Amino acid sequence: MFQTGGLIVFYGLLAQTMAQFGGLPVPLDQTLPLNVNPALPLSPTGLAGSLTNALSNGLLSGGLLGILENLPLLDILKPGGGTSGGLLGGLLGKVTSVIPGLNNIIDIKVTDPQLLELGLVQSPDGHRLYVTIPLGIKLQVNTPLVGASLLRLAVKLDITAEILAVRDKQERIHLVLGDCTHSPGSLQISLLDGLGPLPIQGLLDSLTGILNKVLPELVQGNVCPLVNEVLRGLDITLVHDIVNMLIHGLQFVIKV
């Protein structure tokens, strides 16, 4: 007759043995899936988001807002500042007959610089990226004549940066900056406030015309070198994943 105590001991030993074997490696010929690549690349949408986040963070940490705040607008507008006779001369000539002494404008101050959400599109052939960098600033035009601000303007401008994957002489592939320019038609200038007694509309129209001529290239010339610097400092893993997609023309910027 089989002893109950022996049965208990048998099952106890069996359970202990199975527990021990549970910690052993699974043989390679079994059909369980193997994790041969634990560090999987980001999904396409995740890759695009990681790129825009990295660029945005790099621009901010690289001093973009300070660059915008210190744009040398007054140096360009005042007499002798980069144009024949200076642009302020033409601007002030239209209103000084109404307001004597307005030629004493001494300051055009940039305030509240902003970097808005970056945009990203991919070329139809899949080999290029175009990053839209939307920027915002406020301009304050001051004069000692009235001891206050004449005008406050809100300005928005987009910079578009082309990103390419290129192969160097050592056959290494890098992300590089292609064309970097202001987006045509993206400059927006709006009046925030101005002193009522002054001929604001005439001053605004003249100043807007001048800013349309000089501001886009001024911003472009100061921001694009920083974009190039940020691009060279991107995380190597992120760069590798993006280069792989661009070289093979694979679409990973998903439009929703």
Curated annotation (Swiss-Prot):
Function: Lipid-binding protein which shows high specificity for the surfactant phospholipid dipalmitoylphosphatidylcholine (DPPC). Plays a role in the innate immune responses of the upper airways. Reduces the surface tension in secretions from airway epithelia and inhibits the formation of biofilm by pathogenic Gram-negative bacteria, such as P.aeruginosa and K.pneumoniae. Negatively regulates proteolytic cleavage of SCNN1G, an event that is required for activation of the epithelial sodium channel (ENaC), and thereby contributes to airway surface liquid homeostasis and proper clearance of mucus.
Any GO MF annotation of the entry: lipid binding
The entry's keywords: Antibiotic, Antimicrobial, Disulfide bond, Glycoprotein, Immunity, Innate immunity, Lipid-binding, Secreted, Signal
Quaternary structure and partners: Monomer. Interacts (via N-terminus) with SCNN1B, a subunit of the heterotrimeric epithelial sodium channel (ENaC); this inhibits proteolytic activation of ENaC.
Recorded family membership: Belongs to the BPI/LBP/Plunc superfamily. Plunc family.
Gene Ontology biological process: antibacterial humoral response; antimicrobial humoral immune response mediated by antimicrobial peptide; defense response to virus; immune response in nasopharyngeal-associated lymphoid tissue; innate immune response; multicellular organismal-level water homeostasis; negative regulation of single-species biofilm formation in or on host organism; regulation of sodium ion transmembrane transport
Cellular localisation: Secreted
Signal sequence range: 1-19
Gene Ontology terms: cellular component: extracellular region; extracellular space
Pfam families: LBP_BPI_CETP
Impact noted for substituting C180A: No effect on surfactant activity
Protein name: BPI fold-containing family A member 1
Species of origin: Homo sapiens
